[in-house]
Amino acid sequence: MTMVKLEQIFWHVWINGDLVPYQFARIHVLTHSLHYSGSVFEGERAYNGKVFKLKEHTARLIKSAEALGLKVPYNVDEIIKAHECVIKQNNIKDAYIRPLIWCGDESLNITNQYLSTNLLIAGIPSMPRSFEKGINLHVSRWRKAMPDSTPVQSKSAAQYNMAITSKKEAKALGYEDALLLDYEGYIAECTTTNIFFVKDKILYTPIADRFLNGITRQTIIEIAKDLGLEVKEERLKLEQIEDFTGCFVTGTAIEVQNIDSIDLGNKKIIFDDHKIADRLKEEYRRVVRE
């Protein structure tokens, strides 16, 4: 998916119940969440004017906020209606949708019971882009935090600091993305996507209890099972990936992306069997437009 430049967007965004022209959507420089990463968000995609898995995304948005102790002044149905308002106002067909919940600028104290909780829903024009060419991964030196040190199932801004750093380092070395390990050295995910491996028509994917269990990940598992494929969720070590013939990642924006190689430092593992990933990609693109 390719994005237009943000300054070229002329759509309206929804902020706390009001539709605001994109260029006038602003927050104060002393906004609490800007300083302390106290915000949560979702990444969603609209296909033919309908957001895929909107109810699931919205429920997770609220759950993410509650995990950080934020009081969300809207329920699932109200947030869904706000999405519909944005889609109708901007005549959206295909777009990336970004809901964001953040704390206001009433105080810079670490905790303050009088901080407001705000909600934004913005649409960003997008169009599908061919991902026929696979990408290459670099194993990041950074590890995912322990689940008891951060709410890993909360899609919070703070969770992305390491992901951003890891991806920057990978790209500087000539790779498209980074593979992240958990605190015990098991394979976790990529910076913004979940990872799958293929061998003998069986899918292997890390257990999603140490990182965000992606909605696209869950959908791909459902599709794979419907196609008669076996899916195994396991703890996976780096040394195991030499046994796999295929690899791909999943995410809302990227959908299904083939992986051509993973550089382990002392050797590069090549994946040249993309048949199952391509089949899943085809079926996923059908499902999201139903």
From Swiss-Prot:
The reactions it catalyses are: L-leucine + 2-oxoglutarate = 4-methyl-2-oxopentanoate + L-glutamate; L-isoleucine + 2-oxoglutarate = (S)-3-methyl-2-oxopentanoate + L-glutamate; L-valine + 2-oxoglutarate = 3-methyl-2-oxobutanoate + L-glutamate
Name positions with the PTM N6-(pyridoxal phosphate)lysine: K155
- So what EC number does this one have? 2.6.1.42
Cofactors required:
pyridoxal 5'-phosphate
Keyword annotations from UniProtKB, A to Z? Amino-acid biosynthesis, Aminotransferase, Branched-chain amino acid biosynthesis, Pyridoxal phosphate, Transferase
Pathway involvement of the protein, from the record: Amino-acid biosynthesis; L-isoleucine biosynthesis; L-isoleucine from 2-oxobutanoate: step 4/4; Amino-acid biosynthesis; L-leucine biosynthesis; L-leucine from 3-methyl-2-oxobutanoate: step 4/4; Amino-acid biosynthesis; L-valine biosynthesis; L-valine from pyruvate: step 4/4
First-level EC class: transferase
* Matching Pfam families: Aminotran_4
Tell me the Gene Ontology biological-process terms attached to this UniProt entry. isoleucine biosynthetic process; L-leucine biosynthetic process; L-valine biosynthetic process
Q: Name one GO molecular function term.
A: L-valine-2-oxoglutarate transaminase activity
Keyword Amino-acid biosynthesis attached: yes
Q: What family does this belong to?
A: Belongs to the class-IV pyridoxal-phosphate-dependent aminotransferase family.
Query: What is the documented function of this protein?
Result: Acts on leucine, isoleucine and valine.
* Protein name per UniProt: Probable branched-chain-amino-acid aminotransferase
State the organism named in the record.
Rickettsia conorii (strain ATCC VR-613 / Malish 7)
